[in-house]
Amino acid sequence: MTGKRHTSGGEALTDLFLAVFRLSGRLLAAGDRLVSDLGLTSARWQVLGAIAFAPSPQPVAWLARSMGLNRQGVQRIVNEMREDGLVDLHPNPHHRRAHLVALTKRGESAFAAASRLQTPWANALAKGFDHAELAAASRTLRALSGRLEKST
């Protein structure tokens, strides 16, 4: 230990980080339960979402960057989903080896089905929370994510 103490902001941020770590684990477990009947996991669902919301097919490295994950982990999931017929790889005119990842019809259907399950789940989970507080929490987490992205 250095003997240095957190500022009040540093202490609050550390508490937030710990809460986010706990939430992340619980969110992944809940997501796994929610989409398991679709043959998905939270990890696959997350990658499907990144592909679905991208403006056009993207290389794995770009998808990983947009999710704050490492390329190797996303590549493994993309490979599995390709074997299962959820995604296809297309030639990239800008890079011979970095193929573009796109959803297949089956992948689009799986993501749509997961989204249909997520809507009532999220609505139920949001009950009792103030909309403005949730929006403020979302803004804060996005701002922290942006700062961390710039610092690496």
Task: Give residue ranges: language-model regions.
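Hydrophobic structural patches
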Residues: V20, L48-I51, L141
